UniProtKB/Swiss-Prot annotation:
Polymerization of globular actin (G-actin) leads to a structural filament (F-actin) in the form of a two-stranded helix. Each actin can bind to 4 others. Identified in a IGF2BP1-dependent mRNP granule complex containing untranslated mRNAs. Component of the BAF complex, which includes at least actin (ACTB), ARID1A, ARID1B/BAF250, SMARCA2, SMARCA4/BRG1, ACTL6A/BAF53, ACTL6B/BAF53B, SMARCE1/BAF57 SMARCC1/BAF155, SMARCC2/BAF170, SMARCB1/SNF5/INI1, and one or more of SMARCD1/BAF60A, SMARCD2/BAF60B, or SMARCD3/BAF60C. In muscle cells, the BAF complex also contains DPF3. It comes from Bos mutus grunniens (Wild yak). The modification N6-methyllysine is found at residue 84. The lineage of its organism: Eukaryota, Metazoa, Chordata, Craniata, Vertebrata. This is Actin, cytoplasmic 1. Belongs to the actin family.
Length: 375
């Protein structure tokens, strides 16, 4: 497809926005889903200070800004800021006119219906797109892995969900959602670093902790054993240099932080861990298809990027499943972007072209058309 008429694929995550052109093998723009507003009064006249900053620019000026994420737990909570992010995506990052391209957006399953209606309305009424579609994130990840059957455990910054898919059909009754993801782990790491005497409190400092988490954390295969090793030696300790040059040391926090994915009680949550959620999701499916799901468990999203997570999932699900069951955890190296990649594949299929919601259909039916045309 040519760039001039190619569909735009925008995966609006709670933490990062991934955007690009259908048919490409990777997103062209990846930036934080952040809108920042100055905390202080501007005193330098004529500097052209803006009243808000989006994405990387907000991130780089974070020291003087209050940072807000308009998407929480996969649901848009601030539509004005969301519009700013889309505007930034089209005009600054991709440099396209949205009224000239069909737009494929993504959404977490089990989102409130009003969320996708409002997305549809903004695309057609604010950005005047000729056509649009809203796809379920996990389904796109399965496309990207080249499968039509499997269970996707997709964990991003705001929401984790398990979606069983059989021969291309998502099984809605068996989809489970867990509001525990990367942002909660960042907050938890902030908390346990405070116990070590390092204080991180502001929205800007939270971003530093997120970086520590992404660079140094890993999932232990055996948590108790790892705790014992950490207590008896300093072999697991790593140091991290803060932006001001101060160096901090982190030890068992490296694996205690992502352990919360398997033991949500660490965060004071009563829900099941990601391994049990995946298992429960499989158990909600017909007995005849479970075998295929166990053998095709696909990890997707940035929060599945911790070293050791696939081995741990394999171990935990093996312990829950029938003893003779073959279990295979698939963790593609590009899984951070597999939702976007799946969207790029889907939007460039010739068979998909009749699936778009056109401006004409929208004008006839209004925003509720999205429930009829998009799963």
């Amino acid at each position: 497809m040519d760039d001039d008429i190619a569909a735009l694929v925008v995966d609006n995550g709670s933490g990062m926005c991934k955007a690009g052109f259908a048919g490409d093998d990777a997103p062209r723009a990846v930036f934080p889903s952040i809108v920042g507003r100055p905390r202080h009064q501007g005193v330098m006249v004529g500097m052209g200070q803006k009243d808000s900053y989006v994405g990387d620019e907000a991130q780089s000026k974070r020291g003087i800004l209050t940072l807000k994420y308009p998407i929480e737990h996969g649901i848009v909570t601030n539509w004005d800021d969301m519009e700013k992010i889309w505007h930034h995506t089209f005009y600054n990052e991709l440099r396209v006119a949205p009224e000239e391209h069909p737009v494929l957006l993504t959404e977490a399953p089990l989102n409130p219906e009003a969320n996708r209606e409002k997305m549809t309305q903004i695309m057609f009424e604010t950005f005047n797109t000729p056509a649009m579609y809203v796809a379920i994130q996990a389904v796109l990840s399965l496309y990207a892995s080249g499968r039509t059957t499997g269970i996707v455990m997709d964990s991003g910054d705001g929401v984790t969900h398990t979606v069983p898919i059989y021969e291309g059909y998502a099984l809605p009754h068996a989809i489970l959602r867990l509001d525990l993801a990367g942002r909660d782990l960042t907050d938890y790491l902030m908390k346990i670093l405070t116990e070590r005497g390092y204080s991180f409190t502001t929205t800007a400092e939270r971003e530093i902790v997120r970086d520590i988490k992404e660079k140094l954390c890993y999932v232990a295969l055996d948590f108790e054993q790892e705790m014992a090793i950490a207590a008896s030696s300093s072999s697991l300790e790593k140091s991290y240099e803060l932006p001001d040059g101060q160096v901090i040391t982190i030890g068992n926090e490296r694996f205690r932080c992502p352990e919360a994915l398997f033991q949500p009680s660490f965060l004071g949550m009563e829900s099941c861990g990601i391994h049990e959620t995946t298992f429960n999701s499989i158990m909600k499916c017909d007995v005849d298809i479970r075998k295929d799901l166990y053998a095709n468990t696909v990890l997707s999203g940035g929060t599945t990027m911790y070293p050791g997570i696939a081995n741990r999932m394999q171990k935990e699900i093996t312990a829950l499943a029938p003893s003779t069951m073959k279990i295979k955890i698939i963790a593609p190296p590009e899984r951070k972007y597999s939702v976007w990649i799946g969207g790029s594949i889907l939007a460039s299929l010739s068979t998909f072209q009749q699936m778009w919601i056109s401006k004409q259909e929208y004008d006839e039916s209004g925003p509720s058309i999205v429930h009829r045309k998009c799963f």
